[in-house]
A protein has these predicted regions:
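Solvent-exposed loop/turn segments at secondary-structure junctions
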Residues: 224-227, 262-268, 298-304, 334-338, ...
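Serine-esterase "nucleophile elbow" of acetyl-processing enzymes
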Residues: 194-261, 280-289, 293
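Second-shell loop/turn segments in exported
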Residues: 225-233, 300-307, 346-350, 392-397
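Internal alpha/beta domain cores that form substrate/cofactor-binding pockets in large enzymes
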Residues: 219, 251-288, 293-295, 300-333
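Catalytic His-Asp segment of secreted/periplasmic serine-dependent ester chemistry enzymes
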Residues: 199, 334-416
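Polybasic, proline/glycine-rich intrinsically disordered low-complexity segments
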Residues: 142-201
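Extended beta-strand solenoid/passenger and fiber regions
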Residues: 1-99, 103-104, 121-134
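Extended acidic/polar, glycine-enriched regions
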Residues: 116-126, 131-133, 140, 144-149, ...
Length: 416
């Protein structure tokens, strides 16, 4: 595939003998005029990202805001009497996260209604399709502030997605996501077909119980992505998606699922909780006496200073499980927003840069655990035409139901 950009919003694409030039619409601009805010908090300079102040309504994501969606310099703050407030004197503002707070001594107090005007740009995914006659055609997607999706294709084969967001001022290679194949891994990375599922080797007791139609208790243990209170339908949680597919794979088995999730926390937080806490490791995980623990901890990604520290903690957990006859499947974490991972692009990101993921993969090679490598799928999404940040409902690190399904995919791959 050859790409040329003869003008800011013009794309010429050549692919397998076909060529076409498309005019791509810039990101949709939304202008908000005199939006009422009954009260604003004081600015907190020590806050985290969007928590320094109050999030503008128009650019909100679930629990957070959409970074870089706001048009720089567009904010105007006025009182109901028409007085314009001054940034740095009356209020402070984070233009990346669209978060605003009042300053002490300014013209407004927390009970002063204010009118805010601003503009922001939405995200969109368009798709280039090869039609039955071999020609190329562009199908425009719908604009969305947080979760744009590719358009529905009525005919033809999608060959590339074009992604634009608030930071896109002109098209480049970064905006074009070729769809290499509708597969979960590259052909050159496909392992040889296994005669025995890896779960049978790594989780022998659990696997045999499933196969024999016995009762099996599975405990899903993790952070907010396991607790998943942000998902409207509990059936969309990764562990529920896994359960349904596991029941289909082993229809005679009697599977009980227990979920132990704690938003914003790590394995260390669980280990340090006192007796009687709803998140005490001993009482809620070990004493539940599951046959299998499946753990998911993206929050552990920044927890360990080196592999030795990781080995000490995960080795302790493994010993605790082994002493009680509990088997362990470990999920590698999904991708979060690029700047949290040390990535500079949502493309060419197959190799997960997080040391934690490397620690997990090495741990699974040398210890009797099952690794379900969801991170591998997330690193491959750009090859499927999917910018991975468009699957994060909070624009940071909470996957939508499709993103959660990749955990179930990674697990079932090892059971089939």
């Amino acid at each position: 595939m050859t790409l040329l950009f003869p003008a800011a919003w013009t794309l010429t694409m050549e692919c397998q003998g076909a060529s076409a030039t498309f005019e791509i619409a810039p990101p949709n601009r939304v202008e908000v005029v005199a939006e009422t805010y009954e009260s604003l908090p004081l600015w907190n300079p020590n806050g985290w990202c969007f928590t320094k102040g109050f999030r503008l309504f128009g650019v909100r994501a679930m629990e957070c805001s959409v970074a870089y969606a706001l048009e720089q310099g567009s904010l105007r703050v006025e009182t109901s009497e028409g007085r314009t407030l001054v940034e740095g004197t009356d209020y402070q503002f984070d233009s990346v996260w669209a978060s605003i707070g009042l300053l002490e001594g300014g013209a407004a107090t927390s009970d002063t209604p204010l009118l805010l005007s601003y503009a922001y740009r939405q995200q969109r995914i368009d798709t280039v399709v090869r039609l039955p006659d071999g020609s190329l055609s562009l199908v425009q997607g719908a604009s969305d502030t947080v979760l744009p999706v590719p358009p529905k294709i009525e005919q033809g084969t999608p060959i590339a997605n074009i992604y634009v967001d608030g930071r896109t001022s002109a098209l480049s290679d970064e905006n074009v996501f070729p769809i290499e194949a509708n597969l979960a891994s590259r052909d050159d990375e496909k392992p040889a077909p296994a005669t025995v599922p890896k779960a049978a080797e790594r989780l022998p007791k659990t696997y045999q119980k499933l196969l024999s139609g016995e009762s099996v208790t599975i405990l899903a243990w993790g952070d907010s992505v396991t607790e998943t209170t942000y998902i409207t339908d509990p059936e969309d949680r990764w562990q529920m998606q896994f359960l349904r597919r596991l029941e289909k794979r082993f229809p005679k088995a009697k599977i009980t699922l227990v979920s132990v999730g704690w938003g914003g926390r790590t394995t260390t937080a669980f280990l340090n909780e006192p007796s009687g806490s709803p998140h005490n490791y001993q009482e809620k995980v070990l004493d539940a006496k599951p046959d299998l623990v499946v753990s998911e901890f993206i929050n552990d990604s920044g927890l360990f200073k080196d592999q030795a520290a990781f080995e000490a903690q995960y080795g302790r957990i493994l010993r605790d499980f082994q002493e009680r006859g509990i088997e362990w499947a470990i999920l590698t974490p999904h991708y979060s927003r690029c700047d949290w991972m040390g990535l500079t692009s949502q493309k060419h990101c197959d190799d997960d840069p997080r040391p934690y993921v490397a620690y997990l993969r090495e741990f699974a090679k040398t210890h009797p655990v099952l690794l379900a490598d969801a991170a591998h799928r997330w690193g491959h999404l750009w090859r499927e035409g999917i910018p991975h940040e468009t699957l994060l409902v909070n624009n940071i690190n909470h996957p939508n139901p499709q993103g959660l399904s990749f955990f179930a995919d990674a697990l079932m791959k090892e059971f089939e």
